[in-house]
Amino acid sequence: MAGIEPPPREAAFLVQELVTDGIEVFAGISRDPDFGLALAFGMGGTGVEVTRDFALRMLPLREGDAHAMIAETRGAALLDAVCGQPAADVASLARCLTVLADFAQQNADLIDEIDLNPIMVLPEGRGCIVADALIIARAHSKAHEA
């Protein structure tokens, strides 16, 4: 057993809130080689692979554009008060999309893609929670050349 180190006395834990009353959506940033950064938004979960129900906008994005993106998806009706469920916090979702777009633009030379999936949209007044996020850095950013 010589040379084997004991495990550290300190341990790290990640504790997260369990979200059970949110509606799953996704948002993603991708880079088109000709047109630049674009934002995709749609209903989350496995259904997006089947339904292809999403909206797409080139950046920059204003909050009004974000509301329009949300409204043009077929799944937008799920964000309304339906089947005894409260309405989702669409205003917070629109702000989330706008902040994501602003972040991508401010870091455009560093980012190729961003994927937020799922974003849990909570009942009105309670906001949104990003449950999983992935950022793919650009291989040849101006920051790396400096």
At which residue positions do the language-model features occur?
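ATP-dependent carboxylate/acyl-activation modules
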Residues: 1-146
